Amino acid sequence: MDPSLVACPAPVSCPSRNLLLYNPVVLPPLSLEATCFLVGLVVGSFLNVVIVRIPAGRSIVRPPSACPACGASIRWYDNVPVLSWLWLRGRCRACRAIISWRYPAVELLTAVLFALAARQLGPTLDLGTALLLLAALVAITGIDLDHQIIPDVITLPGVVVGAVANLAIRPEGWADTLLGIAVGGGLFLIIILASGGGMGGGDMKLGAMMGAFLGWKLVLVAILLGVFAGGVVAIGFLSTGSKGRKDPVPFGPFLALGAVVSLLWGPSLLAWYLGRFFG
């Protein structure tokens, strides 16, 4: 028997005993981050399927993953996130066709985001809702970059899931959740009406989904950051001549970036801003 347990019979005065015996679901911070990183790799592999199949109107469940060049089914040992791509040197085992680097990139991105969320939020219910939002944002980013669309099949259920999750965790915060949806979607509705359709309805629904998860304060931070990032990139495109004024630039990835920053560091940014200018 561990002598430390004998010397400390009272549960209240023995933190190590409490952690190991009375609260087994609590993980040390590093273990939680590592666990979320591994979960993120697996989720990222699934998101690759979502990014490819949803725009094509295909099922994300069946058939199993296959090589896009030859159609050969991908065996489980060739479908291990990141590692299989490295082992096969980015090629299909059957036909040796090149497999895009985007597949491991999406897996790694999702894993890193999940680990960051674990570090920032810890073992809380908020972490669960954060992981759902991050997964949706990664999928939306990939689809918008490829097809310049933000699928309703992700954003509309996302509004419901975000609202229900937040209301379940904090029933007293219902006003913040509803205001978040109204602010996130309403700002883009105003832009759409004012510009005569200069911005798509997908951005409006994405804004509403972000608001459902983040609440009205953090969704404002997310939108401001997204607009700033999008403006910087647009200026870069125009100055280098790589895109003209009328060339479409998907805005979803910039909103997703703003939402990620707001989710992970938004409260700190708000506290800094309010203290700096109004403190």
Predicted segments, located by residue:
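Select subsegments of transmembrane alpha-helices in polytopic membrane proteins
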Residues: 99-107, 152
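Long, highly hydrophobic alpha-helical transmembrane signal-anchor segments
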Residues: 23-55
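Functional transmembrane core segments of multi-pass inner-membrane proteins
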Residues: 36, 127-235, 271-279
